[in-house]
Amino acid sequence: MAKTILAARKHIKKQVVDGIAHIHASFNNTIVTITDRQGNTLGWATAGNSGFRGSRKSTPFAAQVAAERCAEAVKDYGIKNLEVMVKGPGPGRESTVRALNAAGFRITNITDVTPIPHNGCRPPKKRRV
């Protein structure tokens, strides 16, 4: 009986020059997603899956580590320029942008896309600590 040899097909990653970094910085976590211009996800990382748990997720250092891991995940695509979209009021807003810049990306512009309600839903009650 003849054996069929299955050739493992190597997945060739397309080369993308320009990308968009979507940063969602909430009070509890930071999510970094890098997409191409059409919005197709190339890689992502969060403070939670970078090894931080509990209140350590909501630190600027955790956001920095998440940005570095996301940059490492998409380096095979050959991205040179990044447009940064920041959403949310969290502590990881600034450190994430600094980490992406330090990872070797040229940041073309930074846009704040935080949704601001025109008097929509009622906000959560104030905390009493």
UniProtKB/Swiss-Prot annotation:
One of its GO terms (cellular component) is ribosome. Transmembrane segments: none annotated. Disulfide bonds: none annotated. The keyword rRNA-binding applies. Part of the 30S ribosomal subunit. Interacts with proteins S7 and S18. Binds to IF-3. Located on the platform of the 30S subunit, it bridges several disparate RNA helices of the 16S rRNA. Forms part of the Shine-Dalgarno cleft in the 70S ribosome. This is Small ribosomal subunit protein uS11. It comes from Baumannia cicadellinicola subsp. Homalodisca coagulata.
